[in-house]
From Swiss-Prot:
GO terms for cellular component: Golgi membrane; lysosomal membrane; plasma membrane; smooth endoplasmic reticulum membrane. A lipid is attached at C4, C7 (S-palmitoyl cysteine). Residues 1-77 are annotated as: Disordered. It is found in: Membrane; Smooth endoplasmic reticulum membrane; Golgi apparatus membrane; Cell membrane. Highly expressed in the medulla spinalis, adrenal gland, cerebrum, cerebellum, and sciatic nerve. It is a lipid-anchor; Peripheral membrane protein. The modification Phosphoserine is found at S46. It comes from Mus musculus (Mouse). This is Small VCP/p97-interacting protein. Keywords: Cell membrane, Endoplasmic reticulum, Golgi apparatus, Lipoprotein, Lysosome, Membrane, Myristate, Palmitate, Phosphoprotein. InterPro entries: SVIP (IPR031632), SVIP_metazoa (IPR055366). It holds the Pfam family SVIP. Interacts (via VIM motif) with VCP/p97. Forms a complex with VCP/p97 and DERL1. Residues 18-37 have a biased composition (Basic and acidic residues).
Length: 77
């Protein structure tokens, strides 16, 4: 009897500081986001390579500017 409560001499275990809690929560959130981003993808590297290639093509199109006036012409005779 009487063993339901801890000894009064024992103190509660120290809780982590708010900064440590914040860091752990941020790490957990980043891990969840990373897992959610790769869910359902078997080959992550190929998807990333395709994304980089697409970005490079878009960048190249943006830097090339509008087409010149020497393009195709429509003539009606």
């Amino acid at each position: 009897m009487g063993l339901c409560f801890p000894c009064p001499a024992e103190s509660a275990p120290p809780s982590p500081s708010p900064e440590e809690k914040r860091e752990k929560l941020a790490e957990a959130a980043e891990r969840r986001q990373k897992e959610a981003a790769t869910r359902g993808i078997l080959d992550i590297q190929s998807v990333e390579a395709k994304k980089k290639k697409k970005e490079q093509l878009e960048k190249q199109m943006a830097t090339s500017g509008p087409p010149t006036a020497g393009g195709l012409r429509w003539t009606v005779s």
